Amino acid sequence: MALAAAFTVAAFGALADPVGSFRVVGTNPDSGGTYQGTVTVSRNGETYRVVWDVAGTRYVGTGLGAVVENKRFLVGPADPADIAISIGYVSGNIFGMAMYFLQDDGTWEGVWTYGGSPKVAKETWYPR
């Protein structure tokens, strides 16, 4: 049995699986300005490998997937049925964390922060 954390959530109606290539649009938590870039998500065994390229900087992360079963949110190994992905990432000396949820229109919406920041920023992934 996989390790899982359970939370009560609403059901999601779109097709699952965060694997793919996406256009990224987000908000910088420090300046409030908008940024754009790309992100690629692939499965790497039981985890996800997530690589962002934004404004000439590469961020590399490892993620866990999540599904809804019996009205409960279960976090565990990467799976094509995942409707959410939780990611820890690094770039040089910078580290951070992020969480994204599949939307009905096929986009992935989430929030992220980085080590030491008191702020949270929003980001949307658009399938390419």
Label for each model-derived stretch:
Residues 2-4, 14:
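Cleavable N-terminal signal peptides
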